Amino acid sequence: MRTLYPEITPYQQGSLKVDDRHTLYFEQCGNPHGKPVVMLHGGPGGGCNDKMRRFHDPAKYRIVLFDQRGSGRSTPHADLVDNTTWDLVADIERLRTHLGVDRWQVFGGSWGSTLALAYAADPSAAGHQLVLRGIFLLRRFELEWFYQEGASRLFPDAWEHYLNAIPPVERADLMSAFHRRLTSDDEATRLAAAKAWSVWEGATSFLHVDEDFVTGHEDAHFALAFARIENHYFVNGGFFEVEDQLLRDAHRIADIPGVIVHGRYDVVCPLQSAWDLHKAWPKAQLQISPASGHSAFEPENVDALVRATDGFA
């Protein structure tokens, strides 16, 4: 079974001002003359991390990571203004142009898969290969499954902590109730809601719960960006024209080679979405990890993803 490549450090770290408000952090790792790949983190709001550098052979790939608007080391932190899917799609192209890349492989999981699909379907985009994991198409049933009722029945212990952040009278629409708190003028209210929202996802991302991963989701800086930006996108339907926009536009990526990796027991993003995407995009290879959950760092998911990037190298 393949594992992550060894730890590496960036050969360049920088910032890119993408408009009058937002400045993005980016870094480059691996071989400056290698095959370019852009890594799209999850959330939205999750930010990139050091382990994301390790899915590609650093001798063969020029690995570009960046923190999306409001995330990680990008500024302003946890900001919701001018922060939509289409702003992020445009930012990917701005970064590509800034770095002098003609075209690149696009690698993304969870929300990163959503953004990768939106980007690849844009006629002006320059993604020529897709490596996707934990497919999330941002349809209403996906959101309701995870944030209203569904996953709650598999993780009732973790769900109770999430649910307790909202009074019973407001629980008929939990995403909206969290939205009111995450956009509150009161800092303590925002932070309490952010931690409850963030920890819920952290507690459900692995087949076997990773307590360190859950603890990381309690970090105030991480949780505020993660919860505020996720919730902002979700209550706005991803800023899509129609709910199934990514499937509607799948014909635009019909000739792009790709690999879809999805854990059989992914509770955060159920396998149905990967199945639906594969039917709409049959050129892609669908690899179901039989004993894995959502996280990219589940051993089977790592194995499949590293094999995919090696295959495209």
Curated annotation (Swiss-Prot):
A molecular-function term among this protein's GO annotations: aminopeptidase activity
Alphabetical keyword list: Aminopeptidase, Cytoplasm, Hydrolase, Protease
GO cellular component: cytoplasm
Upper lineage: Bacteria, Pseudomonadati, Pseudomonadota, Gammaproteobacteria, Lysobacterales
Reactions accelerated catalytically: Release of N-terminal proline from a peptide
Protein name (record): Proline iminopeptidase
Record SUPFAM superfamilies: alpha/beta-Hydrolases
Function: May be involved in proline metabolism and sensitivity to ascamycin. Has ascamycin dealanylating activity.
Compartment(s) where it occurs, according to its Swiss-Prot or TrEMBL record: Cytoplasm
Alphabetical list of Pfam families matching this protein: Abhydrolase_1
Gene3D superfamilies linked to this entry: alpha/beta hydrolase
First-listed, main subcellular location of the protein, grouped into a coarse class: cytoplasm
